[in-house]
């Protein structure tokens, strides 16, 4: 059974996608994708042999050994020249780790990135766009009192404003939840802030967020 956090990623995966799931979370979403006939097969990878072994146990319980190819290793490094992958799925990792994973020559073969992170979205958007991608979808997810943002990148070139890189594209789903969280966070910081310049800067960010919510 997969939780709402993982389930929120499924709609971004199409039947023609050839997927590697990096950091495979016990293969839960991968089993779901196969059993529900969304994908015919998938490669999963995890740098932790213990986590991967748990995934392999789940795969065997569901008799999907011939559909889910489990490999232990660091991100895209598990792929070889014979693998025909065009889509990367990454969830439950920090932005710096994600960017290290994407720093790989195999990325040239990738057309779609489905990424779920819980921090450093500005850095994530800015750096992935530099790699030749543009944002096609964004959605705010709250699961077990934690907030995540799903960002789907596809190949393409598009210019974004600094506000879009910081706070997301205009049609980001459930953005009000995220903006309200940030406004409350910034307002609490202002209560104890002594630096006038930083106070003004943060107040400006709050005003921007309030405008984005309209």
How does the language model describe each region?
Residues 41-46:
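Conserved SAM-binding motif I beta-strand of class I
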Residues 27:
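Glycine-rich SAM-binding Motif I of class I
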Residues 22-23:
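Conserved S-adenosyl-L-methionine
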């Amino acid at each position: 059974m997969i939780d709402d956090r993982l389930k929120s990623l499924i709609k971004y995966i199409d039947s023609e996608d050839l997927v590697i799931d990096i950091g495979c979370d016990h293969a839960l979403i991968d089993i779901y994708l196969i059993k529900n006939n969304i994908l015919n097969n998938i490669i999963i990878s995890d740098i932790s042999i213990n986590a991967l072994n748990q995934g392999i146990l789940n795969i065997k319980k569901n008799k999907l050994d011939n559909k889910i190819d489990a490999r232990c290793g660091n991100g895209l490094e598990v792929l070889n020249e014979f693998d025909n992958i065009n889509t990367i799925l990454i969830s439950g990792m920090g932005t710096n780790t994600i960017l290290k994973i994407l720093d790989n020559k195999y990325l040239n073969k990738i057309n779609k990135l489905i990424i779920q992170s819980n921090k450093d979205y500005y850095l994530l958007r800015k750096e992935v766009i530099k790699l030749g991608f543009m944002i096609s979808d964004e959605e705010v997810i709250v699961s077990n009192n934690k907030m995540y943002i799903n960002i789907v990148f596809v190949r393409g070139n598009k210019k974004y404003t600094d506000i879009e890189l910081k706070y997301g594209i205009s049609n980001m789903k459930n953005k009000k939840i995220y903006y309200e969280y940030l406004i409350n966070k910034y307002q609490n910081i202002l209560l104890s802030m002594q630096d006038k310049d930083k106070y003004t800067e943060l107040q400006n960010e709050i005003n921007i967020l309030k405008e984005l919510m309209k």
